[in-house]
UniProtKB/Swiss-Prot annotation:
SUPFAM superfamilies the record matches: Alpha-macroglobulin receptor domain (SSF49410), Anaphylotoxins (complement system) (SSF47686), Terpenoid cyclases/Protein prenyltransferases (SSF48239), TIMP-like (SSF50242)
Lineage: Eukaryota, Metazoa, Chordata, Craniata, Vertebrata
Residue intervals of the NTR domain: 1518-1661
Species this chain originates from: Homo sapiens (Human)
Keywords: Age-related macular degeneration, Cleavage on pair of basic residues, Complement alternate pathway, Complement pathway, Disease variant, Disulfide bond, Fatty acid metabolism, Glycoprotein, Hemolytic uremic syndrome, Immunity, Inflammatory response, Innate immunity, Lipid metabolism, Phosphoprotein, Secreted, Signal, Thioester bond
Record annotation: effect of changing N1163R: Impaired binding of C3d to CR2
The protein's name in its UniProt record: Complement C3
Site (described: (Microbial infection) Cleavage): S541, G542, L744, G745
InterPro entries on file: A-macroglobulin_rcpt-bd, A-macroglobulin_rcpt-bd_sf, A2M/Complement_sys, A2M_N_BRD, Alpha-macroglob_thiol-ester_cl, Alpha-macroglobulin_TED, Anaphylatoxin/fibulin, Anaphylatoxin_comp_syst
Coordinates Mg(2+) for interaction with Complement factor B Bb fragment (CFB), annotated site positions: N1663
Disulfide bonds: C559-C816, C627-C662, C693-C720, C694-C727, C707-C728, C873-C1513, C1101-C1158, C1358-C1489, C1389-C1458, C1506-C1511, C1518-C1590, C1537-C1661, C1637-C1646
Length: 1663
């Protein structure tokens, strides 16, 4: 420093004399954001102090300081080097509820002996974190979402608090709201939500917040869609994470496909590339390729030419900055499954790296080392590892990046104060100069106090720290040698997760420029911390100086505690489905561990929103209150940027923090970072209190009542009924299957001897997508604090990889998410039954069972069977099994297609079993298939009504009658569901903005002068402080300025006391007569100031007493005997008209404002107020001036007397309904309108208020100026009151009740403002009219929507494609293979129904049973010059070619594309199952069309019997008419008396109606031999139905008689319209006519028929 001139040096010395003599400096340090209900630390220091220093720390509310939120005491002693700390907690008081969303502050005060140090600190209302875990990431309609909420504080330890939870639909509307407490739950709240069947598809949200901090919302998402889990996953991986634009080779990409159980996929991939520019996507059609996936992978390249040709301006430079995406669709050779995957965000770059300085401080200390933390990323943002970087111009300064992409470069800086420009570049050898990345930054010098050039530099080694290691922190000092001996220690502070973790001192000996602090890293330091250090001294200038630095240090992310899930098995065997397995959980003793196992297929569909430990740390890091990677522009900047406040007794302090968020983007990016068992299973799924309901539901019922009927006898509430019904239905279905399994003993062939019988194969049937939603407490004796728990679990039936996810919560170590533990479950022979999400009733579909043989060298001969289920029409019947024998080569698969027609809606079971010949190997799979009704699902809006009972009701009650929906086009035998939706309509009340704090600066003035002038001076400051307090605007005005303003008010108060007379009244001068108005005004101002400064109540109440006793007349009027000199200060009272009314109103207002303070001291006060009020009320109607109407109106409103005619006068006086104005004086009008606004607020007339406030705001009157005292005071008092009282919404409190005829009681809902947006929903299956009644305030909306299935006009099962398939016998001339029994030609024609040709498309052809395609024909189609197809694929097993896949390069949109090839029949089967052809686009399975084919059946359709839209299967053996005489009487009697036979009739055929598919025979019932369920009378007619294929077998003739009997299961339809089906079990026998009985050949039959009839009628059946 240069020499200082004499006088100014002297001045400096004088100014800082006490400091120069070494007076102590007291300092307080706290985080610059304090959090509610969290333990916070304050560091206290007394530098250069002697002896003990007692310290009291108090925390007050701001600005009022009315409450002590916390108070702590401590003593700083020489033994602790006068350093200490206190911890305090700020309770979540009402004070901190911020309705207007404004920031909240507290005043933190430390009193060191007599010296007070205080600081206003920002408060965060966030009281911890909430983490949400769902059991899956994606769900189907009708399934259940299981979720957990983890409640933790800022230290991530469990807390018990009330949590509000909302579930929102994709439109953002909440459909469920809950309030729950995590008290005694160890921070884990388990919840669930049942997704309705009718639900909006898309991304749903779970949002949660702590009740006391609603503004801090934590959320997670889950997807709802109709899907089927895939069997494999596809990964698209470019060889480089970027595309270098000048790379001639192009972009190389590997497509990997693996089954979920780990085996490699064989198939075909369709790959297309595209360019992404922001939201816009341009696909590159020329890049579309089909590649084989062999042994699980395939390669594809996007050439540079295809890329450049695909864009309009093929300049390479124009593509830089954009990115590439690649989409791959992989289809299995069997065609049974298809999975899509995409990789996007592959940047197009000129350099493969990017350099960032986000981890480098922005400030350097001149002449000291500067640590550059260079963060190098790959273009996708992931950290780049082992990349050399150097500083340009200083080639010696080089470093390699570490695993997190960061390299440390230290450079020496020049001692000058100039900004420093630094350029860093990569030095990767393989890259040319042009390809290296380069970046420049500018660092600014740290500024010292008075240019002292005293510095401190903190430096740490660049390593990835882990808990348990030691970090050496270097403290480097640079300062004036003359003063260095003064630095005996450094104070250091460690900030972590927004709190002061540790504070300490590091001793320094004289002469030490470098001091090292060894810092032990513990788990408390995760995920990162800031170390701040400082020293203080009195410098050469005699001025106290603080010098500081800080450094940000990253710590390896891991759990604070420990949690590992692994296998507890000793031997490493491959787990198989249903097997028991042991899990080993190792974690912190006493922790609660929650588990879930998820099928990996779920993550193939959606891998977002999984809860991981790194996500937890990301949330914590986002909440970091520090804002930079270290250092700062000066000492105060260092503290502020690290998230600390520093305040000292010598005037040093950090700037006021007024925002919770950091000013710029975060300074850091984290690293890329058999029945009984089933019964017990079922019961275990329910909570304890509902288990009894479930157990009872599964008990046998002696009366054989249905489950539904049994629930009517339950009185334990709806939840119990629901569980009972679920468990009852479950066990009924199980019993049914069990019974079926034990009765199906059908004939077997000799072949079956060396093979497991079908009934001995237990099918796999439990395929949950997630399970193991368990809670385990680790109470086992610990070893080194770790408890080990062994858990036995039974694996589910899926063949997949399960991801077992575990989260632990410990009250000592907090939350920990373990790495997922994978369990792969498989067997070497199994069936994968691929079912669609849903199928339509009565629509023929093809499903596929894929058989896998993973045996190394063994070909397997397998018998596979589709089991009969009466809910489907298929080749499997009660009488005949649908079995096939197939051969599967080793390590391959085979697809077996089945054609079925579903006949019943709901969940129906499909079961396939397979057994291997000569091996004891089998598998079975039973899955549920969702069958939906025919027709189109329609949502019909029945009614939308606005509920507003005040406006639309009668005497406050609104009734709405809602009609039933018109369902005339509904599909028969389907249900409808009506949803009644209710929602409140929250109407926001626009509140006018507060006057900006900036505009009030001129009001803070110093009062002076006589008793009147002093009040003129004091008024603006009092009202300004009051206004800023009420509107919470100090942070705008300057938080530190409030104290100064209070000092001015104190000064004004003290000065005013000089003008108080012995009578307690006030005058301009002590000797002057006291003034009524002035005394009342002093009372008014002081009453307001009581909340700001200490005011003696005797001063205030003495003046009140004087006004009542000396100046109030018996009629209540107040009189003025000594008017004020400064008439300009009395505002609108200056006008002499209506003086008595105006003055009385003015004094009365003052008395009422002092009432709370003086009521006890002045006994006459209530009486005085009443008298004055009586006077005003009596004379109010005669008032002429708007001013008097306003001021007297406010005085009366305060008393609750402004009503009726008075109120009417008050309101009608307002001009344009927005101001109370007398011509002439603008200031009087502002004052009068302000009184009127206060009156309106008192009346809570919020409809009238807004225009008045708007008018006042439009006057742009901000106080001040001559004659403005009253206008200033009143306008800000009124506007402050408005900001405080004005509601931000209209009142909403609606009671809505629904009376549904089908329900015995009313359904009621109460809608409040808080829950207005919640969508309340009621469902009913009845389509009925009902009544809605609404009462209360506010508005709501009622919507009624009925969902039903409507008959389709022309049902199109095809989307975007037309398809025609024909099969005909081949001409005799065609040559056929030797072993072929028959040859036919299959012709397929297709066309795309789009605007242009379809690109690559696929024909998926399943062959008819026993048929295979001619491979020579296929080769010719693929390899001929006229290539019709691009490629074909057949199942590898030669003799059982079940599926053929043909790839087409394109499908024309303008004409039919046709191809034909021969198919040969190699073996005969009794019944040929139809084949299917499906055409679809490679990128979208929805764009498809399916057709069936069969040699004998039109369209390849299975026969089914439909009548009045009811269908059943008829693909069974036709009945054969009993016509020969071999049938004996006994046989007839035995057969007619078999169980199940319902009726026996003698009938006469009246009429035959033939049709295309089914024939109807109208029979007259001549005699009822055995009556059945149909109460038919003799002579009545009944319809018997038979499929046309049985016409020949039946040969029925009109007018002939027949003996008929049949089963009840052959009835069709409902009474009284019952029809009878002639099925395989129906007996039809010609009954000869009387004349025919004379013939000898018929005599025996006629006698037997007579005897049969007599026996049946007289004796009936023996059983």
């Amino acid at each position: 420093m240069g020499p200082t001139s004499g006088p100014s040096l002297l001045l400096l010395l004088l100014t800082h004399l006490p400091l120069a003599l070494g007076s102590p400096m007291y300092s307080i340090i706290t985080p610059n954001i304090l959090r509610l209900e969290s333990e916070e630390t304050m560091v206290l220091e007394a530098h250069d102090a002697q002896g003990d220093v007692p310290v009291t720390v108090t925390v007050h509310d701001f600005p009022g300081k009315k409450l002590v939120l916390s108070s702590e005491k401590t003593v700083l002693t020489p033994a602790t080097n006068h350093m200490g700390n206190v911890t305090f907690t700020i309770p979540a008081n009402r004070e901190f509820k911020s309705e207007k969303g404004r920031n909240k502050f507290v005043t933190v005060q430390a009193t060191f002996g007599t010296q007070v140090v205080e600081k206003v600190v920002l408060v965060s209302l966030q009281s911890g974190y909430l983490f949400i875990q769902t059991d899956k990431t994606i769900y189907t309609p009708g399934s259940t979402v299981l979720y957990r909420i983890f409640t933790v504080n800022h230290k991530l330890l469990p807390v018990g608090r009330t949590v509000m939870v909302n579930i929102e639909n994709p439109e953002g509307i909440p459909v469920k709201q809950d309030s729950l407490s995590s008290q005694n739950q160890l921070g884990v709240l388990p919840l669930s939500w049942d997704i309705p069947e009718l639900v909006n598809m898309g991304q749903w949200k779970i949002r949660a917040y702590y009740e006391n901090s609603p503004q801090q919302v934590f959320s997670t998402e889950f997807e709802v869609k109709e899907y089927v889990l895939p069997s494999f996953e596809v990964i698209v991986e470019p060889t480089e994470k970027f595309y270098y634009i000048y790379n001639e080779k192009g972009l190389e990409v590997t497509i990997t496909a693996r089954f979920l159980y780990g085996k490699k996929v064989e198939g075909t991939a369709f790959v297309i590339f595209g360019i992404q520019d922001g939201e816009q996507r341009i696909s590159l059609p020329e890049s579309l390729k089909r590649i084989p996936i062999e042994d699980g992978s395939g390669e594809v390249v996007l050439s540079r030419k295809v890329l450049l040709d695909g864009v309009q301006n093929p300049r390479a430079e124009d593509l830089v900055g954009k990115s590439l995406y690649v989409s791959a669709t992989v289809i299995l050779h069997s065609g049974s499954d298809m999975v899509q995957a995409e990789r996007s965000g592959i940047p197009i770059v000129t350099s493969p790296y990017q350099i960032h300085f986000t981890k480098t401080p922005k400030y350097f200390k001149p002449g000291m080392p500067f640590d550059l933390m260079v963060f190098v990323t790959n273009p996708d943002g992931s950290p780049a590892y082992r990349v050399p970087v150097a500083v340009q111009g200083e080639d010696t300064v080089q470093s390699l990046t570490q695993g997190d992409g960061v390299a440390k470069l230290s450079i020496n800086t020049h001692p000058s104060q100039k900004p420093l420009s630094i350029t860093v570049r990569t030095k990767k050898q393989e890259l040319s100069e042009a390809e290296q990345a380069t970046r420049t930054m500018q660092a600014l010098p740290y500024s010292t106090v008075g240019n002292s050039n005293n510095y401190l530099h903190l430096s740490v080694l660049r390593t990835e720290l882990r808990p348990g290691e030691t970090l050496n922190v270097n403290f480097l000092l640079r300062m004036d040698r003359a003063h260095e001996a003064k630095i005996r220690y450094y104070t250091y502070l460690i900030m972590n997760k927004g709190r002061l973790l540790k504070a300490g001192r590091q001793v320094r000996e004289p002469g030490q420029d470098l001091v090292v602090l060894p810092l032990s890293i513990t788990t408390d330091f995760i995920p990162s911390f800031r170390l701040v250090a400082y020293y203080t001294l009195i410098g050469a200038s005699g001025q106290r100086e603080v010098v500081a630095d800080s450094v940000w240090v990253d710590v390896k992310d891991s759990c604070v505690g420990s949690l590992v899930v692994k296998s507890g098995q000793s031997e490493d065997r491959q787990p198989v489905p249903g097997q028991q397995m042991t899990l080993k959980i190792e974690g912190d003793h006493g922790a609660r561990v929650v588990l879930v196992a998820v099928d990996k297929g779920v993550f193939v569909l959606n891998k977002k929103n999984k809860l991981t430990q790194s996500k937890i740390w990301d949330v914590v890091e986002k909440a970091d209150i520090g804002c930079t990677p270290g250092s700062g522009k000066d000492y105060a900047g260092v503290f502020s940027d690290a998230g600390l406040t520093f305040t000292s007794s010598s005037g040093q302090q950090t700037a006021q923090r007024a925002e919770l968020q950091c000013p710029q983007p975060a300074a850091r990016r984290r690293r890329s970072v058999q029945l009984t068992e089933k019964r017990m299973d079922k019961v275990g799924k329910y909570p304890k209190e509902l288990r009894k309901c479930c157990e009872d539901g599964m008990r046998e019922n002696p009366m054989r009542f249905s489950c539904q009927r049994r629930t009517r006898f339950i009185s334990l509430g709806e939840a119990c009924k629901k569980v009972f019904l679920d468990c009852c239905n479950y066990i009924t279905e199980l019993r049914r299957q069990h019974a079926r399994a034990s009765h199906l003993g059908l004939a077997r062939s000799n072949l079956d001897e060396d093979i497991i019988a079908e009934e001995n194969i237990v099918s796999r049937s439990e395929f949950p997508e997630s399970w193991l939603w368990n809670v385990e407490d680790l109470k086992e004796p610990p070893k080194n604090g770790i408890s080990t728990k062994l858990m036995n679990i039974f694996l589910k039936d899926s063949i997949t990889t399960w991801e077992i996810l575990a989260v632990s919560m410990s009250d000592k170590k907090g939350i920990c998410v373990a790495d997922p533990f994978e369990v792969t479950v498989m067997q070497d022979f199994f069936i994968d039954l691929r079912l669609p999400y849903s199928v339509v009733r009565n629509e023929q579909v093809e499903i596929r069972a894929v058989l896998y043989n993973y045996r190394q060298n063994q070909e397997l001969k397998v018998r596979v069977e589709l089991l009969h289920n009466p809910a489907f029409c298929s080749l499997a019947t009660t009488k005949r099994r649908h079995q096939q024998t197939v051969t599967i080569p080793p390590k391959s698969s085979l697809s077996v297609p089945y054609v079925i027609v579903p006949l019943k809606t709901g969940l129906q079971e499909v079961e396939v079993k397979a057994a291997v010949y000569h091996h004891f190997i089998s598998d079975g799979v039973r899955k549920s298939l969702k069958v939906v009704p025919e027709g189109i699902r329609m949502n019909k809006t029945v009614a939308v009504r606005t509920l507003d009972p005040e406006r639309l009701g009668r005497e406050g009650v609104q009734k709405e009658d809602i009609p039933p929906a018109d369902l005339s086009d509904q599909v028969p035998d389907t249900e409808s569901e009506t949803r009644i939706l209710l929602q409140g309509t929250p109407v926001a009340q626009m509140t006018e903005d507060a006057v900006d704090a900036e505009r009030l600066k001129h009001l803070i003035v110093t009062p002076s002068g006589c008793g009147e002038q002093n009040m003129i001076g004091m008024t603006p400051t009092v009202i300004a402080v009051h206004y800023l307090d009420e509107t919470e605007q100090w942070e705008k005005f300057g938080l530190e300025k409030r104290q100064g303003a209070l000092e001015l008010i104190k000064k004004g108060y003290t000065q005013q006391l000089a003008f108080r007379q012995p009578s307690s009244a006030f005058a301009a001068f002590v000797k002057r007569a006291p003034s009524t108005w002035l005394t009342a005004y002093v009372v008014k101002v002081f009453s307001l100031a009581v909340n700001l400064i200490a005011i003696d109540s005797q001063v205030l109440c003495g003046a009140v007493k004087w006004l009542i006793l000396e100046k109030q007349k018996p009629d209540g009027v107040f009189q003025e005997d000594a008017p004020v000199i400064h008439q300009e200060m009395i505002g609108g009272l200056r006008n002499n008209n209506e003086k008595d009314m105006a003055l009385t109103a003015f004094v009365l207002i003052s008395l009422q404002e002092a009432k709370d303070i003086c009521e006890e001291q002045v006994n006459s006060l209530p009486g005085s107020i009443t008298k004055a009020g009586d006077f005003l009320e009596a004379n109010y109607m005669n008032l002429q001036r708007s001013y008097t109407v306003a001021i007297a109106g406010y005085a009366l409103a305060q008393m609750g007397r402004l009503k009726g005619p008075l109120l009417n006068k008050f309101l009608t006086t307002a001009k344009d309904k927005n101001r109370w104005e007398d011509p002439g004086k603008q200031l009087y009008n502002v004052e009068a309108t302000s009184y009127a606004l206060l009156a309106l607020l008192q009346l809570k007339d919020f409809d009238f208020v807004p225009p008045v406030v708007r008018w006042l705001n439009e006057q742009r009157y901000y106080g001040g100026g001559y004659g403005s005292t009253q206008a200033t005071f009143m306008v800000f008092q009124a506007l402050a009151q408005y900001q405080k009282d004005a509601p931000d919404h209209q009142e909403l409190n609606l009671d809505v009740s629904l009376q549904l005829p089908s329900r015995s009681s009313k359904i009621t809902h109460r809608i409040h403002w808080e829950s207005a947006s919640l969508l309340r929903s009621e469902e009913t299956k009845e389509n009925e009219g009902f009544t809605v009644t609404a009462e209360g305030k506010g508005q709501g909306t009622l919507s009624v929507v009925t969902m039903y299935h409507a008959k389709a006009k022309d049902q199109l099962t095809c989307n975007k494609f037309d398809l025609k398939v024909t099969i005909k016998p081949a001409p005799e001339t065609e040559k056929r293979p030797q072993d072929a029994k028959n040859t036919m030609i299959l012709e397929i024609c297709t066309r795309y129904r789009g605007d242009q040709d379809a690109t690559m498309s696929i024909l998926d052809i399943s062959m008819m049973t026993g048929f295979a395609p001619d491979t020579d024909d296929l080769k010719q189609l693929a390899n001929g010059v006229d290539r019709y197809i691009s490629k074909y694929e057949l199942d590898k097993a030669f003799s059982d070619r079940n599926t053929l896949i043909i790839y087409l390069d394109k499908v024309s949109h303008s004409e039919d594309d046709c191809l034909a090839f021969k198919v040969h029949q190699y073996f005969n089967v009794e019944l040929i199952q139809p084949g299917a052809v499906k055409v679809y686009a490679y990128y979208n399975l929805e764009e498809s069309c399916t057709r069936f084919y069969h040699p004998e059946k039109e369209d390849g359709k299975l026969n089914k019997l439909c009548r009045d839209e009811l269908c059943r299967c008829a693909e069974e053996n036709c009945f054969i008419q009993k016509s020969d005489d071999k049938v004996t009487l006994e046989e007839r009697l035995d057969k007619a008396c078999e169980p199940g036979v319902d009726y026996v009739y003698k009938t006469r055929l009246v009429k035959v109606q033939l049709s295309n598919d089914f024939d109807e025979y109208i029979m007259a019932i001549e005699q009822t031999i055995k009556s059945g369920s149909d109460e038919v009378q003799v002579g009545q007619q009944r319809t018997f139905i038979s499929p046309i294929k049985c016409r020949e077998a039946l040969k029925l003739e009109e007018k002939k008689h027949y003996l008929m009997w049949g089963l009840s299961s052959d009835f069709w339809g409902e009474k009284p319209n019952l029809s009878y089906i002639i099925g395989k079990d129906t007996w039809v026998e010609h009954w000869p006519e009387e004349d025919e009985c004379q013939d000898e050949e018929n005599q025996k039959q006629c006698q037997d028929l007579g005897a049969f009839t007599e026996s049946m009628v007289v004796f009936g059946c023996p059983n």
